[in-house]
Every structure is written in structure tokens, then in C-alpha cells.
Amino acid sequence: MQVVMTDLPAPTAIRRTVCFSQAIVLGRTEVEGVAAVLAADAAEAESLLAQEVVPVLADPDCRCRQVLRPDAEVDAILAKRNLGTAITDAPVVIGIGPGFTAGADCHAVVETMRGHTLGRVIYEGSALPNTNIPGLIGGYAGERVLRAPADGIFHQLLDIGAEVKAGDVAGEVNGLPMRCTIGGVVRGILPEGTPVHQGMKSGDVDPRCRPEYCTTASDKALAVGGGVLEAILHLSGCLLYTSP
């Protein structure tokens, strides 16, 4: 399976050490042994596919779709709403999380809420509604998320992997501190100079204190990714179900 990815010209991913979008910033990045390389356009993306790497384009509107004509399209923006994806975009269209309705604007939806149904493929209807409450990790939910204290430009003070305690300042905006409310390891944080608005998710503290988790895909990412793969294989006819 060949994969091409697109993102914003200035990605806002928090867990940058496990995000292929970093290829847009660095030119090349690697996640668990899989390499991703920045592509200038769709033609270069096709060339990079022959090198067995993941091409990443700064193409927030996915205009490359017209050239690449993918067999499957996955909207993993996680905006909690549909920003324009249509069921006619590709033979198989998959929406990730709330905001999509299988059968209306996509062929399948993959559940993103932590819990019993995480990663489940939905072929009719929608994912569970957004609660604005992060899932539990190490006994903590909303406390582990770091949010911008004001509108402005984010100033990064700590790196991913840094050990912190409650009260430590991980970043600041307009001189206002963004403090950690629990102890643990900084699992993700926005890069220096990112424009933010008050309350915007700007970092994440993992209370389990396992630095190695910063460089590997999470259980949630693996579950959702598995759901995406299942949906693509099923909807494309690669998975054929037979009666016992």
C-alpha cells in the first residue's frame, strides 16, 4: 500500500516526534523506522513513492488529489467537524472521529474516543460526539493537556521528553506562563513561533514518566490506524468475508 500525506505549511501537531508532518519542517523525518520526505508537488510525490518513503506535501486543501487520483482518501484532520471532505473524493473515503456521517460524506468513520469502541469502523452513522474531555492516561484526563494562556505567538521553553513536575512552565504566550498541572514527561509541545489562541491545545504531559513513549505511536494511534486499514481493505474488496 502506497501512502501520500498532506498537512498545513506550518503543521500544528503536538506529538512532533511521531508525526510525519515534521517532514514539512525538516525536509525528512522518521517514525519507528518509516521515513517521510517533503514533496514539492504531486509529481515529486509519485517519484518518492518509488523510493519506498512516505511523501508529505504542504497542501491543506489536498489539491494533489486531482493529479494523484487515490484509491482511498482518509480525512485525519481531527477538526471534530467536516471541513470539506466529500464521499465523491475517491472510491473509498474515510473520516476520522466526530464530524462525519458514514453513507453521507464518507464511506466509513473510525472511532477516536478512548474506551470500548476506540478504533471501531462505523459503516452507518457517526462517531461518538466530542466531549472536549481528553481520555484517561495514567489516571489523568484534562489535567495532562497544556493549553495556551492567551492569543499570540507561542514560545517553547521545554523540549519533548523533558521531565516536569506540577507548576513547571513549559511555554509562554505574551509573557504569560503555560504551566504543567501534573508531573510526568512532556510527550508533545508546539514548536517555537506557532500562532495560538487562548485555550488552544499546545502541549501534553504523560504522567506515566516513560520517555520512550515520546518516540513511539500510542495505543490510540495504533487502534485508529488499524481501523483505517480495516476500512480500506473491506471497502476496496480486499477483505472477502465468507460464511463458516
Go through each PLM region and give its residues.
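Buried, small/hydrophobic-residue-enriched core segments of structured protein domains
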Residues: 1-125, 216-237
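C-terminal, active-site-flanking charged/polar segments
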Residues: 2, 188, 196
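Generic structural motif
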Residues: 71, 107-108, 114-116, 123-171, ...
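Flexible, active-site-proximal loop/turn residues at the rims of small-molecule/cofactor binding pockets
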Residues: 79, 176, 208
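Accessory, usually C-terminal, subdomains that scaffold auxiliary metal cofactors
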Residues: 191, 197-204, 208-223
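Conserved small/polar residues in nucleotide/adenosyl-binding loops
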Residues: 241-244
